[in-house]
Amino acid sequence: MKSLINRPEFRQWIENSLDRQENVLAVSNQGTILHYNRDGQDLIVKTAMGRGLVRLLRHRTLLREYEAYQRMEGVQGVPACYGLVDGRYLVIEYIRGTPYRDAEWSDRDAWFDSFLRVLRDFHQRGVSHGDLKSKTNIMVTEDERPCVIDFGTAFVRKSGWRWINNWLFEH
């Protein structure tokens, strides 16, 4: 996967998709989300949008999201992160499934037990999602497993005396 995201053709695909408004999965106030599905690779590419200070702040959010994904590498129930292209496009695994609010599944108790494990796993890695009230950030995968997506509002635990950060992870 690293070889794909380091290829100039992939960066060109991203820039062409943005210029032509193709392969767009979603657009939010933060940025554009592209869907790349070729040669067995099913990926999401997140980009920051805006100009000047607004773009800078949104790019910083994207970098914080990248840091959160790095900490959660290998956690079941969190999409794999493949890195940054040119330091500005975040590439993550595309998750096939249904948003929690629209999903139906056979064993709710087992699903919620698994969901709680996912939450505990990324909290143990020093990551708090920040927006689980949005049920679109909680997915039920095609094989009925929980998956938490979109860590754009995540908090990452920092070491040292950072009273707000420490307080967030104590509560």
Region locations from a protein language model:
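Active-site beta-strand termini and strand-to-loop segments that position acidic
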Residues: H35-G40, E93-Y94, T141
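Short C-lobe core helix of eukaryotic-like protein kinase catalytic domains
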Residues: S114-Q124
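C-lobe/activation-segment region of protein kinase-like
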Residues: T141-H171
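Conserved structural core of kinase catalytic domains
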Residues: R58-R64, A68-S114
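Juxta-kinase regulatory segment immediately upstream of eukaryotic protein kinase catalytic domains
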Residues: M1-V24
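Short, glycine/acidic-enriched loop or turn micro-motifs at the edges of active sites
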Residues: R96, S134, T153
